[in-house]
């Protein structure tokens, strides 16, 4: 007779207490999902976005975070966007935070292994957060940018750009040139 192990589903709070060491994981509907490492190209584009945001947002009250900062998207889901921007978390009381639940903008750098989840599951989770105004997907293989922006209660506009375009983020009052996102130096 076969034995089936049944594991209890985790809450976001329980998940955040687990030390995964060098490994990365997300919590998806109470289930731990291990994450693979990225490529050099992925890391470069992620770094370019973070740097562009950090330089433009300094002194604005908004702070960009890399993928070390967790976003609590639901009581049973924790995500680690490639880059996220939060407002109002710049006080000393937030210095030891490991997760926030109110990003204003979220960036996901797509890879073959994550694109399906990023473009479906995570998009829905991010859109459900009242604080999120802008979700940006970066397709590094094709140098495409997809910008999903809130237009009001329940309204969203979704634009994809195949040609180089400036990435405007009205909620943050900044623009990032396409060339800066994909820069190799």
For each feature predicted by the language model, list its residue ranges:
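Gly/Pro/Ser/Thr-rich low-complexity, intrinsically disordered segments predominantly at protein N-termini
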Residues: 1-185
């Amino acid at each position: 007779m076969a034995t089936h192990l049944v594991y209890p589903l985790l809450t976001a709070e329980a998940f955040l207490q687990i030390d995964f060491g060098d490994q990365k994981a997300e919590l998806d509907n109470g289930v731990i999902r291990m994450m693979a490492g990225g490529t050099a190209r992925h890391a470069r584009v992620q770094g370019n976005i973070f740097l562009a945001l950090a330089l433009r947002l300094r002194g604005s009250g908004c702070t960009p975070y890399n993928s070390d900062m967790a976003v609590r998207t639901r009581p049973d889901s924790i995500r680690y966007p490639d880059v996220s921007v939060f407002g109002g978390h710049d006080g000393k009381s937030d210095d030891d935070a490991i997760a926030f639940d109110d990003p204003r903008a979220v960036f996901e750098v797509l890879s073959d292994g994550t694109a399906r989840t990023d473009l479906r599951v995570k998009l829905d989770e991010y859109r459900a957060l009242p604080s999120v105004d802008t979700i940006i997907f970066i397709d590094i293989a094709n140098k495409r940018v997809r910008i999903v922006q809130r237009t009001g209660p329940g309204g969203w506009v979704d634009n994809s750009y195949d040609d180089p375009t400036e990435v405007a983020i009205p909620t943050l009052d900044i623009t990032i040139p396409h060339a800066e996102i994909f820069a190799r130096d």
